[in-house]
Amino acid sequence: IDHVVNSPEPFLSTTIGRYGNRIAKGKFTLYGEEHELTINNGPNSLHGGPTGFHARVWDADQLAENIIQFNYVSADGEEGFPGNLEVEMVYRLEEEENALVIEYRATTDKATVVNLTNHGFFNLAGISNPTPTIENNIVTINANFYTPIDEVSIPTGEVAKVEGTPMDFTTPHTVGERINDKFQQLINGAGYDHCYVLNKIETGSLDLAATCFEPNSGRTMEVYTTEAGVQLYTGNWLNGFEGAHGATFPARSAICFEAQCF
């Protein structure tokens, strides 16, 4: 696992916490109290900080042949977050459905912020060297709205319609079809790196969020979540590092669908 532990891409297919995505200037106010976090992404805190959940050793317990439970206790003040947070994460492989199910539970003894997600990077074409681009992947996202970002990838506070913009994946489009358009949001993110506001049947329901089809292999991945949003990230900042089996990963050679709050 050296390629994971020593990876220059620290969030490669890891569990993200306490808080997935960026917190502006590493600060937030909760019930009138300001909390300062570790800065690790320009002026911001990203994915829980440099030693967030992705960098922690979790306790593991195999509950069944296809089920593993992980537990971690994040101490009060870790990376600046308040409260002792007990986290339980279960990975379950459903062979008949050809599905990987990830479940999270967290409890705290003090008011805090939590936004857990999985930062899986996918290339459905399979392993080769260099890893092929994901720009030919055909993506559909069940979302009529998204959250625009500024030049340092912080949400502006708006919730904008995707209709009539390159952000619209309500019908199938390849990733590369519009990714280089002179559209300010794609310039800000160096590609797609945005939260999509999912069309939910009801709050907390398990719904289809996104579909990704790789035409050369014929592989399709469906993403379901109970969360309100999903972050589409097209590997814009991958820099050619070496991963498993000697494969290298240049920019836009992997795609992420990060289920999350927003």
Model region roles, listed by residue range:
Residues 1-262:
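An exposed, glycine/acidic-rich loop-and-rim segment of catalytic or binding clefts
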